[in-house]
Curated annotation (Swiss-Prot):
<comment type="function">
    <text>Soluble retinoid carrier essential the proper function of both rod and cone photoreceptors. Participates in the regeneration of active 11-cis-retinol and 11-cis-retinaldehyde, from the inactive 11-trans products of the rhodopsin photocycle and in the de novo synthesis of these retinoids from 11-trans metabolic precursors. The cycling of retinoids between photoreceptor and adjacent pigment epithelium cells is known as the 'visual cycle'.</text>
</comment>
<feature type="binding site">
    <location>
        <position position="201"/>
    </location>
    <ligand>
        <name>11-cis-retinal</name>
    </ligand>
</feature>
<dbReference type="GO" id="GO:0019841">
    <property type="term" value="F:retinol binding"/>
</dbReference>
<dbReference type="GO" id="GO:1902936">
    <property type="term" value="F:phosphatidylinositol bisphosphate binding"/>
</dbReference>
<keyword id="KW-0175">Coiled coil</keyword>
<keyword id="KW-0683">Retinol-binding</keyword>
<dbReference type="InterPro" id="IPR036273">
    <property type="entry name" value="CRAL/TRIO_N_dom_sf"/>
</dbReference>
<feature type="binding site">
    <location>
        <position position="179"/>
    </location>
    <ligand>
        <name>11-cis-retinal</name>
    </ligand>
</feature>
<comment type="subunit">
    <text>Interacts with DEGS1; the interaction increases synthesis of chromophore-precursors by DEGS1.</text>
</comment>
<feature type="modified residue" description="N-acetylserine">
    <location>
        <position position="2"/>
    </location>
</feature>
<dbReference type="Pfam" id="PF00650">
    <property type="entry name" value="CRAL_TRIO"/>
</dbReference>
<dbReference type="InterPro" id="IPR036865">
    <property type="entry name" value="CRAL-TRIO_dom_sf"/>
</dbReference>
<keyword id="KW-0813">Transport</keyword>
<dbReference type="Pfam" id="PF03765">
    <property type="entry name" value="CRAL_TRIO_N"/>
</dbReference>
<dbReference type="GO" id="GO:0005502">
    <property type="term" value="F:11-cis retinal binding"/>
</dbReference>
<dbReference type="GO" id="GO:0005813">
    <property type="term" value="C:centrosome"/>
</dbReference>
<dbReference type="GO" id="GO:0007601">
    <property type="term" value="P:visual perception"/>
</dbReference>
Length: 316
């Protein structure tokens, strides 16, 4: 008889209880969306351990290793030199975002740092004078929106309601600039780093004029933002109420999507039963088929930046 070998670890009752809790979470089990995380919930720490290979010892070792890798690679290629320059003065919490986004694989975290810097070099128009005040009016208009409550998985839910979007009044680039500011701001929160984001795109009222007005290059820029350019875990993208000609726009996007993100795209149309199984109607505004009042972008901007007169004015 051949010997059976392997490594076995006794799972504590506390750990098992946390894993059981993870299977039946509600929106009330998570911390606030806005502001820094005061304390990571125990079940979220367990999730980080199970999904991201995170432990207290690993955090310290991985940050140290990533810092060293940044310096080691600084003299190799231009983007590596740019990474080293961009990372000067960054604290451990900044590096930890990238490590968590790549499940504590330090080399993949470094590649993400390169993507983060390269995206800024590739699309400088998105980052020119990029301050909270520069994008505030776009966010107040709801492009994009952010729910005040996390979903049951602890993810931040971002909204886009295309019906009233005038792409001549608010350009595609202005919306992407708003996304960039929002992502930087929300990723200061450790719960968000671990649990990630969910995006809901409401295409009710999407016109053929809007469809023809969006350039393929703009769609690619959006996909580049979602893939390998931010230390963010994009866990799901839901499209609802899309008309038949939405397929044309989506077919332009699909070739740019990597298989991992493509698997996380859900196109619901008018059949929303599975959508509401994932996203509780009690956290959704009325204009997204939920039980809350209509979405208020001005309230969101205040949550992000404070009142207008006190808003930050620091370039990212």
């Amino acid at each position: 008889m051949s010997a059976v070998t392997g490594t076995f670890r006794i799972v504590s009752e506390e750990e098992q209880a946390l894993r059981t809790k993870l299977e039946r979470l509600t929106t009330k089990d998570h911390g606030p969306v806005f502001g820094r995380c005061q304390q990571i919930p125990p079940h979220t720490l367990q999730k980080a351990k199970d999904e991201l290979n995170e432990t207290e010892e690993q955090r310290e070792a991985a940050v140290k290793a990533l810092r060293e890798l940044v310096q080691e690679r600084a003299g190799s290629e231009d983007v590596c030199k740019a990474v080293a320059e961009k990372m000067q003065g960054k604290d451990d919490s900044f590096f930890l975002r990238f490590i968590r986004a790549r499940k504590f694989d330090v080399h993949r975290a470094y590649d993400l740092l390169k993507g983060y810097v390269n995206f800024r070099q590739q699309y400088p128009e998105l980052f020119d004078n990029l301050t909270p005040e520069a994008v505030r009016s776009t966010i107040e208009a709801g492009y994009p929106g952010i729910l005040a409550s996390r979903d049951k998985y602890g993810r931040v839910v971002m909204l886009f309601n295309i019906e009233n979007w005038d792409y001549e009044e608010i350009t595609f680039d202005e919306i992407l600039r708003a996304y960039c500011v929002i992502l930087e701001k929300l990723l200061e929160n450790e719960e968000t780093q671990i649990n990630g984001f969910c995006i809901i795109e409401n295409f009710k009222g999407f016109t053929m004029q809007q469809a023809s007005g969006i350039k393929p290059s703009e769609l690619k820029k959006m996909v580049d933002m979602l893939q390998d350019s931010f230390p963010a875990r994009f866990k799901a993208v839901h499209f609802i109420h899309q008309p038949w000609y939405f397929t044309t726009t989506y077919n332009v996007v699909k070739p740019f999507l990597k298989s991992k993100l493509l698997e996380r795209v859900f196109v619901h149309g008018e059949e929303l039963e599975s959508f509401y199984q994932e996203i509780d109607a009690d956290i959704l505004p009325a204009d997204f088929g939920g039980n809350l009042p209509k979405y208020d972008g001005k309230a969101t901007a205040e949550q992000l930046f404070g009142p207008r007169i006190e808003a930050e004015d620091t370039a990212l």
